[in-house]
C-alpha cells in the first residue's frame, strides 16, 4: 500500500515536470498513471473487489490524507493540462474540476477552471456561480475577471433575447 502511494507520488511529480516543459499529453499520461496506482485504495469509493473477500489492511489516517492529496492535485492538474490542449475537452475539464471541488470547495484554481468549462459548455449560470466564487478568493486575477465579464455579457444577451421572445409571444 505504501509502495503504491509512493509510486503515485512519483508519477504526479513526473506529470508536474512534463507540464512545466509544456508536454501536456505526457503530463496527462503521468497523472492518469498516478490515479491508477491509487485505484482501489480509497475507502470513500466503492470497490468491486470488496465483494470478493477480505481486503488488505486499511489505510492509516495519514495514508488516507496522502492519497486524497495526490488525487486532488492530479485532478486539478489534469484540468489545467486539458485547457492547454487543442481541441479542449471542456466536459472533462468540468468533471476533473468538480472532483477537486468535492474535496476542496474553496480551491480557487478549480473554481476558475470549472467556470471556464461551464462557460464553454454554455451553462452560463453555473459558470457565473463558479467564477464569482473564484473572484472572491482571487480578486486580482485578470483571467478570472475576464471570464466573469464574458459570462455576465452572455447572460445579459440571453436575457435580452428571452425578453424579446416573450414580448413577441405575448406583446
Swiss-Prot record:
Keywords: Repeat, TPR repeat. Transmembrane segments: none annotated. InterPro entries: AIP/AIPL1/TTC9 (IPR039663), TPR-like_helical_dom_sf (IPR011990), TPR_rpt (IPR019734). This is Tetratricopeptide repeat protein 9C. TPR repeats lie at residues 8-41, 72-107, 108-141. It comes from Mus musculus (Mouse). The keyword Repeat applies. Belongs to the TTC9 family. Coiled coil: none annotated. SMART domains: TPR. The keyword Nucleotide-binding does not apply.
Amino acid at each position: 500500500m505504501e509502495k503504491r502511494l509512493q509510486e503515485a507520488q512519483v508519477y504526479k511529480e513526473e506529470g508536474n515536470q512534463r507540464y512545466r516543459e509544456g508536454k501536456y499529453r505526457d503530463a496527462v499520461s503521468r497523472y492518469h498513471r498516478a490515479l491508477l496506482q491509487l485505484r482501489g485504495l480509497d475507502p470513500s469509493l466503492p470497490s468491486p473487489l470488496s465483494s470478493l473477500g477480505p481486503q488488505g489492511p486499511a489505510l492509516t489516517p495519514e495514508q488516507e490524507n496522502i492519497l486524497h492529496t495526490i488525487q486532488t492535485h492530479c485532478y486539478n492538474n489534469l484540468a489545467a493540462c486539458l485547457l492547454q490542449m487543442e481541441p479542449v475537452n471542456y466536459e472533462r475539464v468540468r468533471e476533473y474540476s468538480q472532483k477537486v471541488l468535492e474535496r476542496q470547495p474553496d480551491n480557487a484554481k478549480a473554481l476558475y477552471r470549472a467556470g471556464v468549462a461551464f462557460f464553454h459548455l454554455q451553462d452560463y449560470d453555473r459558470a457565473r456561480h463558479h467564477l464569482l466564487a473564484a473572484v472572491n478568493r482571487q480578486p486580482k486575477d485578470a483571467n478570472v475577471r475576464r471570464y466573469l465579464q464574458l459570462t455576465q455579457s452572455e447572460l445579459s444577451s440571453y436575457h435580452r433575447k428571452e425578453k424579446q421572445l416573450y414580448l413577441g409571444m405575448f406583446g
